[in-house]
Structure formats: C-alpha cells, structure tokens
Curated annotation (Swiss-Prot):
GO term, biological process aspect, one: cytoplasmic translation
Single GO MF descriptor: structural constituent of ribosome
Gene Ontology terms: cellular component: cytosolic large ribosomal subunit
UniProt feature, compositional bias: Acidic residues: 310-327
Summary of the function given for this chain in its UniProt record: Forms part of the ribosomal stalk, playing a central role in the interaction of the ribosome with GTP-bound translation factors.
Name of protein: Large ribosomal subunit protein uL10
Lineage: Archaea, Methanobacteriati, Methanobacteriota, Stenosarchaea group, Methanomicrobia
Superkingdom, natural source: Archaea
Keywords: Ribonucleoprotein, Ribosomal protein, RNA-binding, rRNA-binding
Signal peptide, first to last residue: none
Subunit structure: Part of the 50S ribosomal subunit. Forms part of the ribosomal stalk which helps the ribosome interact with GTP-bound translation factors. Forms a heptameric L10(L12)2(L12)2(L12)2 complex, where L10 forms an elongated spine to which the L12 dimers bind in a sequential fashion.
Pfam families recorded: Ribosomal_L10, RL10P_insert
Similarity comment text for this entry: Belongs to the universal ribosomal protein uL10 family.
Amino acid sequence: MAELHHSEHIPQWKKDEIEEIKSLIESYPLFGVIGIEGIPAKQLQSMRRDLKDFAVLKVCRNSLTRRALDQSSDDVKKMDDYIDVQTALIFTKQNPFKLYKLLEKSKTPSPIKAGMVATSDIIVEKGPTSFPPGPILGDMQGAGIPAAIDGGKVVIKETKAVAKAGEVVSQKLAAMLTRLEIYPLEVGLDLRAVLEEGSIFTPDVLAIDEEQIFSNFVQAAQQAFNMSVNAAYPTAMNINTLLAKAASDSRNVAVNATVYEPGIMDILLGKAYSKMMAIASAASSNDDALDDELKEALGAASSAVSAVEEVVEEQEEVKEEEEEESDMASGLGALFG
C-alpha cells in the first residue's frame, strides 16, 4: 500500500517573512526580542521612525518568528524562549548595554486603564490640586483618594498608596488618576533578551548603574596608582611622583647623615643655626656666656617674636570690640524694634 505524505502549505508571503527575519539575523551582529504589548499602533510606528538611524525594528507573527529561529543556528534557537504575547525583533550594530539604555530612555509615562494590574505601588502625593470645590471631591474620595477642601481648592490630605503592586485598578481610580495627570505606566519597547556572539543578555544583566561603575573605576585606578608608587614600579602615570619621592627621600637621608653637598648645605646650615640659637637662649641667663654678636642676634629674634605677638593681640582686641559693638547693636535693635 502506498504511503501518503502530507505537507503543510505555507503561503508565499509567510515564506518571505521567514526569509527576511533569517536574513536580518545573519546581517547584524546583535538582535533582540522585544515586548510591544500595550503600545498603540501609531506610537509603535513613531518608535520605529525614531530607531531607524541605529536599529531595525521588525514586527511579525510569533509563529513566523519561531519558524525563522528554528531554521537558524543553535544559539539563535535559544531566543525562542523569549517569544511570548506581542513580540517584535530588533536588529542593530550597537552593543547590548547601549541598546538597553536607549530603549529605556525612549519609554514615556502612560495612564493606566480600568481593569489593568498595577505593576508597582501607585502613590498620590499630599498637596493642592487645580480643581475647585465640586462633585470631583466626592469622585476622588470614592476612588480612595483622601481629598478635602482647603483655601477654595481641592487638596489631597496625605500621601497614600491608592493601589498596591499586583492589584487591579478600578474604573473610578483609573479615571481620577488620569484627571490628576498621574501616569503610573511606562510605555515603550520592553527588551526581553539580546543575543550577541552566542551570548544571551537579559535586562537584569544590562541594567547597570553607570555612576557606580564609573566610581569603581576611579577607585580602582587610584588604588593601582598608590600600589605602584609604594612598590616603586615605574609607569608613565607615576614616574613624576616616584622621582619626586626619591628626591625627597634622598634629601632626608643626606640631611640626617650630614652629607655636605651643594643642595644640602643650606638645609644643614639652617638646622645648625636653629640649634645654635636654642643653646644661646638657654645660656643667655649668664652674661659672660654669649658674645655681643650672638646677644644681638638673640635679641633680634626675640623682638621679631614680640612683634608678631603684638600684632596677634591687636587683632584679637579689634575682634572683641567688633563683637561688643555687634552685641550692643543687637540689644538696641531688640529694645526699639
């Protein structure tokens, strides 16, 4: 008995779609799977235009996308795990982190509709509104918003979470949030996964804190610099510091060892002079211990110190007088208003 073979007939336009997806995958070093649920067609077209300079956005039926992935390499086939609900593919030459950042920045606030589930806590802040007293007060209270009238305006009395994450938003609350211009949702292209050179990157990996990363690099560079200086390991970055440190260390050794070199003599003479003056000061109680020249030098040093002390005392007296005048002025101001 002859065996019957049945083959599924696929329309040409579907074959063309599958081939186009396969061609795009081969033409770009990176492609990603994007969620587009909840995005109006008009807004999606606008996003496609905004992306055209650095990426290609391809919207296709999930069944055709899966066929294209299944006919590609083993690495590409793994991306089938991220095909779900409303999906699009994006193809680019950008790196995964830059792509994720660009897509996140393109997201815009959007009102939540009745029956939708809150993805995070929806908060209304305490403060005045632009609404005059009227029926809206009852509408706000009916939606669970703590509203009252104050100064001829409707105000929100306290900050409150009117819907918790995971809760379904009611018709009344959805309408009132829109009137208050509170848009809890972010509408945009939701990157689910990216494939680059056989590696799959998901949002939890791509969502990096750039400021923290930069701070870590700066700290690491500083630590590496300090380590290289302490280890006396010369590099283009630290050579000036090492030379300055070596010069300072050698100068200290020469001074402590009393080495008579041109660059050291002034320091040694200054050090010897200071010691001489200290000894002279200690011996000055005996008139015969010092000659006239040394007495004169010691007197000049003493006069210089006295002059400095007098200047300091005068400055302190002026400061005290200014404080007294300020206190007196404050007292008169308090007395006469």
